[in-house]
Amino acid sequence: MSFVESGRRSAPLRRRPGTPVPFARPAYSVFSQGDSWGEGEVEEEEGCDQVARDLRAEFSAGSSSKLRKDPVLQPDGDGSPVLPDKRNGIFSADAGGKALARRWPVQVLSILCSLLFAILLACLLAITYLIVKELHAENLKNEDDVNTGLLGFWSLLIISLTAGFSCCSFSWTVTYFDSFEPGMFPPTPLSPARFKKMTGHSFHMGYSMAILNGIVAALTVAWCLM
């Protein structure tokens, strides 16, 4: 062992306890190239650096394209554009209050339209009830004291079918708009291809109840007019 080697080995021992030891990056020799472990580490570090650079480039390109696509709002009094107050995908309380303030007229209008529709439906049902009551009261008695209605068979059948079809159509429309997939067209209760795949059964109970409502309405009107 030479004095130079002993001096190199004893140099770290002569450092003070509080002095940080500089760590040099290991340099790989020519013999570590090829299929060795050193080349894998170098290639992995270079690959990570390349991935980081690609991610930075994508983020910068995405942010710049978003700024170009987003419309700039009207400038404020000082000339600076007003941007939406949104941080981390969440609007602030002021922005939420403004959205609610803009939305309440639409909600009030929808409530008024619903009330108007309910009033019109009630008026239509009241008029229908009065007509049915008058037709049921105007019966004639023949010589054998048997009540004979003014309506014939075909008139009674047409009125009953019209009432049943109207009730069935209304229930069908309500079920269609209230279903979990209102975009499915046509709204049929029998759709084994798609409905069975989604729910496990091929018959929609809501549509069957709509058909049952129409049948019951037709029978009720026919019984009242007889």
UniProtKB/Swiss-Prot annotation:
<dbReference type="InterPro" id="IPR029383">
    <property type="entry name" value="ARL6IP6"/>
</dbReference>
<keyword id="KW-0812">Transmembrane</keyword>
<keyword id="KW-1133">Transmembrane helix</keyword>
<protein>
    <recommendedName>
        <fullName>ADP-ribosylation factor-like protein 6-interacting protein 6</fullName>
    </recommendedName>
</protein>
<dbReference type="GO" id="GO:0005637">
    <property type="term" value="C:nuclear inner membrane"/>
</dbReference>
<dbReference type="Pfam" id="PF15062">
    <property type="entry name" value="ARL6IP6"/>
</dbReference>
<comment type="similarity">
    <text>Belongs to the ARL6IP6 family.</text>
</comment>
<feature type="modified residue" description="Phosphoserine">
    <location>
        <position position="2"/>
    </location>
</feature>
<feature type="transmembrane region" description="Helical">
    <location>
        <begin position="205"/>
        <end position="225"/>
    </location>
</feature>
<keyword id="KW-0597">Phosphoprotein</keyword>
<keyword id="KW-0472">Membrane</keyword>
<keyword id="KW-0539">Nucleus</keyword>
<feature type="modified residue" description="Phosphoserine">
    <location>
        <position position="36"/>
    </location>
</feature>
<feature type="region of interest" description="Disordered">
    <location>
        <begin position="1"/>
        <end position="26"/>
    </location>
</feature>
<feature type="modified residue" description="Phosphoserine">
    <location>
        <position position="80"/>
    </location>
</feature>
<feature type="modified residue" description="Phosphoserine">
    <location>
        <position position="60"/>
    </location>
</feature>
<feature type="modified residue" description="Phosphoserine">
    <location>
        <position position="65"/>
    </location>
</feature>
<feature type="transmembrane region" description="Helical">
    <location>
        <begin position="111"/>
        <end position="131"/>
    </location>
</feature>
<feature type="transmembrane region" description="Helical">
    <location>
        <begin position="150"/>
        <end position="170"/>
    </location>
</feature>
<feature type="region of interest" description="Disordered">
    <location>
        <begin position="62"/>
        <end position="81"/>
    </location>
</feature>
